[in-house]
């Protein structure tokens, strides 16, 4: 167990935390949904992704943290789906944010 990260400005009690890397989650999504996602195609899948982003926007305007969390998960799952059907490795793609040489990054 480790101490949970800051959430809304406060620390929660010690909770079990499962660590999963981006590739592991992307593989889970691919195993469950890739066949169907490929049949649906990129344009329709992108529309599902946008719908989930809209649901996240609505959730963010509320005080329902559980719903906000659920919608973040949905957005990330659909982002993984899009990455899977366009052959993008999200973990590799996100590595550009791990250094100081990110375009537009200005160290403080």
Give the positions of each predicted feature:
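Flexible "arm" and connector segments at domain edges
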Residues: 2-72, 76-108
């Amino acid at each position: 167990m480790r101490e949970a990260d800051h959430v809304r400005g406060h620390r929660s009690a010690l909770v079990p935390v499962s660590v999963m890397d981006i590739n592991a989650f992307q593989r889970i999504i691919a195993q469950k949904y890739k066949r169907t996602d490929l049949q649906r195609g990129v344009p329709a899948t992108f529309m599902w992704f946008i719908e989930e982003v809209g649901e996240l926007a609505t959730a963010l305007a509320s005080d329902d943290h559980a719903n906000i969390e659920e919608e973040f998960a949905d957005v990330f799952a659909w982002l993984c789906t899009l990455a899977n059907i366009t052959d993008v490795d999200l973990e590799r793609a996100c590595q550009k944010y791990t250094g100081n040489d990110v375009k537009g990054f200005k160290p403080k």
